[in-house]
Amino acid sequence: MSSFDFLNELPKELQNKIRNITRALPSSLEVFQELYNYGLSHSDNIEKKRKVTSNGVIDEQNIIFSLKNVSVLSPIRKKLDLVLHLSSIDHKPQLSLVKNGVSEFSISNLKDNVKMGTFLPVPEKPNLLYLFVQLKKVNDKDQDPILLTMNKENVLTEFKSMGLIGQEVDDFNKCTEYIRKQAILTGFKIANPFNPSVEQPVPSFHVECHRGTKEGTLYFLPEIIIFGFKKPILVFESSNIESISYSSITRLTFNVTLIKKVDDGYGTKFEFSMIDQTEYSKIDDYVKLKQVKDESMSEELKAKTANKNKQQNNTSDQPSALQEATKQMETEGNINEIPFDSEDDEEADGNFEDNSDLSDGSEVEEEDNEEENEEDEEADGGDYAEEDFEEDEIIQEQANPAVNQLISKTTPINKNSSNAGLFDFPIETPSFDIPIELEDNEDDEEGSGVEYD
């Protein structure tokens, strides 16, 4: 390792301090190198001081308080006993997770190693309560917190059997108060911000949300915000939150983004999504009480929102069929100049039968051939043509008035035309004969009347 290689393993602030010293006193570099090597060789011992060996048996005479058979979720998942006791080595308080009297995880020097502890409600399970204990960093690395679940009925029964509370007591707050006092005796504090009997300066609450694909609970406490309880569990000091913003607001949900002042390794922005709209007022009141800056209307977010809305509305920017038709009529000037295709594919036009506003000329043709086909229609179900004519009249009456108005504006009206149809403008009808084959025997059997080729 070269002279300054070890500096790259240190925080930048510490690197700068060491470089300033070594510039003034070059011989000190060797001392810093030795100190770094010593720290590496003894880092395992530092961690071991926080834990007892897995086969350490706890003397019952050293137990201050114990809670049997609780569900531990972190740092290990197991049914264990929570025990506050004195160390058999230095007789200082320790917190241990124990199975059959043997410690599987233990924290010593609780006053220095425990950052905070709190009771938290379990959403939709009023008979359960979380105990969350956050540990301080070791070598700038976050440690998994202690998280366990207590069953209120079981704890009440256990406390009564140990004589810690009276048999008539059913208030679980009596149990939490006793546990808090035992924790204070061993060097750390456990908060109970959701205790309804104690007025809080900042009301605590929790909301359901998602972080990415992980569903969890966001707890807003007087001094901290916790997201759990799937790893990594996130803990934010409210004083370390620079600003907050709201986004993706819908009728039912919205998103919240917390922006931290200092990057602690996770990043500075944390977005929580799918929060119920009914929770907005609680979060907004919390933000105002903590004097956190609301960045929802920042220029950056407004630009992102505008860009997102533009992308979502790209399809609406495309001209609709009605707009295309209007443009075509304005360009060509007169609907009579629009070419008619005699081989129009009716099957390809999905709206042909339901939404057609124009006659296909069959009425004119029927008028021209009415006298010639009158006797044939009477012999072969003459009601056919009459019913067809009545259906055309119904369709005309139900035609979209908006389209009628549109066409009347863009097409000159010819009131004197004898061929004026539904919209009172001339329609040039192609003059050609359509051969009609009459097969009396088949028509009588099928009742079809007339066949069109």
From Swiss-Prot:
GO MF terms, alphabetically ordered: double-stranded DNA binding; histone binding; identical protein binding; nucleosome binding
InterPro entries named in the record: PH-like_dom_sf, RTT106/SPT16-like_middle_dom, RTT106/SSRP1_HistChap/FACT, Rtt106_N, Rtt106_N_sf, Rtt106_PH
Compositionally biased spans, kind Low complexity: 304-315
SUPFAM superfamilies linked to this entry: PH domain-like
Matching PANTHER family: FACT COMPLEX SUBUNIT SSRP1, HISTONE CHAPERONE RTT106
Role of this protein: Histones H3 and H4 chaperone involved in the nucleosome formation and heterochromatin silencing. Required for the deposition of H3K56ac-carrying H3-H4 complex onto newly-replicated DNA. Plays a role in the transcriptional regulation of the cell-cycle dependent histone genes by creating a repressive structure at the core histone gene promoter.
Subunit structure: Interacts with histones H3 and H4.
Record protein name field: Histone chaperone RTT106
Organism expressing this protein natively: Candida glabrata (strain ATCC 2001 / BCRC 20586 / JCM 3761 / NBRC 0622 / NRRL Y-65 / CBS 138) (Yeast)
Organism phylogeny: Eukaryota, Fungi, Dikarya, Ascomycota, Saccharomycotina
